Amino acid sequence: MQYSMRHLPVRWLVATALLLGLLAGCQSTPPSPSKENQAAIDRMLVLVDERLEVAPQVARSKWNSGADIEAPEREAAILDRVTGRSAEAGVDESFARDFFQAQFEASKEVQRRLHQRWLKEGRGPFDNPPDLAEEVRPVLDRLTPALIVSLGELQSLVKVPGVGSYLEARATELVTGDFDGDPRRIALEPLKDR
């Protein structure tokens, strides 16, 4: 069978289209985590969201009292405590330290942004600001052990194919009220970097 030169471009285009179709079919999307792993990830994201929801209360209290957002000595003491408790629960110490440091940084980012907004608005003191010792710390004290348990569940999952993409997708749904997503990104960075 003879082909004229004018048929070659058509055959080439057809062959190229078939090859591209085959290659596109070979691209694999990351597998979805199991339902059990999805539930573990969702639990962590809900806890991170609950912790970030405390940040505006802290910001209001510090706005009224004039206290600094940064409290390095207090943070260091808390970080040492939660890292030790995490290690006792079988969580890798550096993973726990990085994770809880990220929670502090995300919370401070929310506080800084609120203080900037209030300063720009010329905001005066809040009526009945939350008491950090009586109202806020008990919430954090309740969340911390749950975060440690969840961190223990996730430390082996974060390396499983498909977990990272699931985590990112669900985070935008479950971690809300954090301005433009920066506090969420900061809070979850240690889970993505493993």
Predicted regions mapped to residue ranges:
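Immediate post-signal-peptide N-terminus of mature secreted/exported proteins
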Residues: 32-70
